[in-house]
Amino acid sequence: MSKITADVLLKEGLPKSIHLKDLKKLNLSKMHLEMKDIDPKLFSQMVNLDELDISHNTLSELPDNLGLHNLRILNFADNHVEDVTVLKQFPNLEEVIYEDNIYLTVSDNYKVFCLLPKLRRLNNKDITSLANHVRFVNHRELSNRVEAHWDSKFKDNLPDKPSSQKINAVAKDFIKSVVNNIKYGPSSLKEFVRWKALGCSGKKRDSADDCTEGSPTKRTRIQHELQSIPLSPRKSNRLQNSPLSLTPIKRKQETSTQGTPSKSTETKSPKVALKSTPSKKQSNESSAKINGKQKLSLTPKIIQKALDNIEPLHFLQCHSKNNSCEDFKTQLWACAFEPILDSSSPKAVATCGGDSVCIIDCETGKVMKKYKVTGEEFFTLVWTTLTMIGKDEQKRKINVLAAGGKHGVVRIIHAKVSLCYGEIKAHKKAISIMCFSPKQDTFLFTGSYDKRIILWDIGVPDCDYNFRPSQLLTLDTTSVPLRMCLVPSCPDEFLVAACEDGCFAWDIRLDKKQGRRSYEVELNFPIYKEERKDNDFHVIDSLAFLNEDIIASKSVMQGSIYLWSWEKTLKTRKTKNVKKLDAVILAQMKWSSSETPYLVLSTSPERYCVFCGDEDGKIWIYDLDSCKADLQRGKLCSVVKEPTKILSWPILFSPKEKVEKTLINVVTVDPTMEYLVALTDINIVSIWKIK
């Protein structure tokens, strides 16, 4: 008679209930259980079971039909289990422990990586990065070797119209040959390679069964050599390979697409006192001691409100070279708000430019953290939130900041503890842009001046901050990627990038064979038809999603911002051979007639707003809430939309210089629309309070 009954399960399970279906957690450890004690009919009633502990028993195997489809954590350590392939019945497993099963080897670990797509921890260690490398990179390589083996040894053995008997005979020989001849990795993984190759050859055999004529052709692999010439990109040379000149001829003004903002929407410039030597007695002092050095910040004395509901709050010089208050030359390039982990955390924004990355408390203007690398020039940064296991074995969420720039190195920073715990030599040229996947918190895309976008799995650090990054995918671009976004409705399928020669989309699905890919489609815009000798308007310097479908983008010197539908544009593609699509424009918004490149727009999906700075220090704000319904329905708007508001740059005073206007390189707002942050070309971080 089985030791395990319904009463035993209810007694050992949590939460306490009289129904098996209510159990979330079950501990059957140290009960001397054998295989015969596990009744699948009984276990399958626990449809909501989340965690199962059957460690320290004498189980030789696990039943293959337990029906626990929602199981996330499984512990069967210290048993006698010999086969892990049975775990594929638990597709939602995130953590497995099977230490001290003496028959299980490192090859079994690799099998588990492939069988369980959501697995993140194995035997109390984070395996995210390694597992994804095995699932995708190793799988692609083994599949290619199996396919090459078929093409070179067995393809010609099949006639044009093979009989089922002939297919079976060839398939049998092929599988046997694969097992004996396909080699990959160290000898300790021999069993895994054999198992994996057997699976790949089985798929090849299945494809042969479906053939009525011919056989699969070998895939041609594209190989490119990495360029090793270093590049130090700045605003003055970022367009050196672009058809747009550095001093372009000004476009003739067109009232339908560009022009200066109307007086009714523009605010006058308030006068602001710029203090470069903070006093200890000042209540709004914004200086911070970092590594023994004083940070200078310039907090304005507000004389006049910029708008009724948006006021300038702080103007900081926290990226100065040698902490000099006279540095008005350092260019600031990127900013991002730190994700909120708890309500007590201050609203913080990370900024980068020059050789430093700063994290600033938006309310106080205090520089809380500063990370500096001598000789580096940071161009981009991005946040992600990881689940880390501490030395106490407790899970906790941490915010991690990735920053990159001129040296092509991604620096990974745990800001809360002021620790840069990792560096990834991602590219041989400068990194221009990065983004994390909203679906996979360890997936980081890096775009570079080497004309490549690379997908990395940065993994999760252990309690000693050891981590293991893995390169999963390479996307070839035809020019430098300037901005990029994952499509929100399918972030594991498509990536869209704005580049120096156009806008492109890539298929990023990792289950495809190609580990290196060119773009899937190129997006064309109406402004292209106005091409001139000095400008073809293909330099797309801004791109951001307004919701899951609508994209805001602009070309340099376009004088307007497009709102276009990703879904409607993709639907116009009749066949996969079509490589160029006309973007389906839903609306057009008037913007500055600026000739300056790299003035980046941003969006607030929560509030349906678009923000963009210009060459005069103005911040253009487009509140699209009133036309939200029309945009979501895909209704076209034939009238060029005016900005809702334009914030003017306040007149700043410092002891030696008056700053009346500047380039606004990037503008962003926090998700709750409390703060607006704008970065300039003259080493000033401006923080505005949204009332």
Swiss-Prot record:
One GO MF term attached to the UniProt entry: chromatin binding
InterPro entries reported for this sequence: Leu-rich_rpt (IPR001611), LRR_dom_sf (IPR032675), LRR_LRWD1_dom (IPR056363), LRWD1 (IPR052489), WD40/YVTN_repeat-like_dom_sf (IPR015943), WD40_repeat_CS (IPR019775), WD40_repeat_dom_sf (IPR036322), WD40_rpt (IPR001680)
Region (Disordered): 202-291
Disulfide pattern: none
Upper taxonomic lineage: Eukaryota, Metazoa, Chordata, Craniata, Vertebrata
Residues in coiled coil: none
Pfam short name (any one): WD_LRWD1
Listed GO CC annotations: centrosome; chromosome, telomeric region; cytoplasm; kinetochore; nuclear origin of replication recognition complex; nucleus; pericentric heterochromatin
Start and stop residues of the LRR repeats: 22-45, 48-69, 70-91
Identification of the protein by name: Leucine-rich repeat and WD repeat-containing protein 1
Skewed-composition ranges (Polar residues): 255-264, 276-291
Role: Required for G1/S transition. Recruits and stabilizes the origin recognition complex (ORC) onto chromatin during G1 to establish pre-replication complex (preRC) and to heterochromatic sites in post-replicated cells. Binds a combination of DNA and histone methylation repressive marks on heterochromatin. Required for silencing of major satellite repeats. May be important ORC2, ORC3 and ORC4 stability.
Keywords assigned: Centromere, Chromatin regulator, Chromosome, Cytoplasm, Cytoskeleton, DNA replication, Kinetochore, Leucine-rich repeat, Nucleus, Repeat, Telomere, WD repeat
GO BP annotation list: chromatin organization; DNA replication; establishment of protein localization to chromatin
Subcellular location: Nucleus; Chromosome, Centromere; Chromosome, Telomere; Cytoplasm, Cytoskeleton, Microtubule organizing center, Centrosome
Chief localization: nucleus
Domain notes: The entire WD repeat region is required for the interaction with ORC complex components, as well as for association with chromatin and for binding to histone methylation marks.
WD repeat coordinates: 426-466, 476-516, 535-574, 593-632, 659-691
Assembly notes: Component of the ORC complex.
Family, per entry: Belongs to the LRWD1 family.
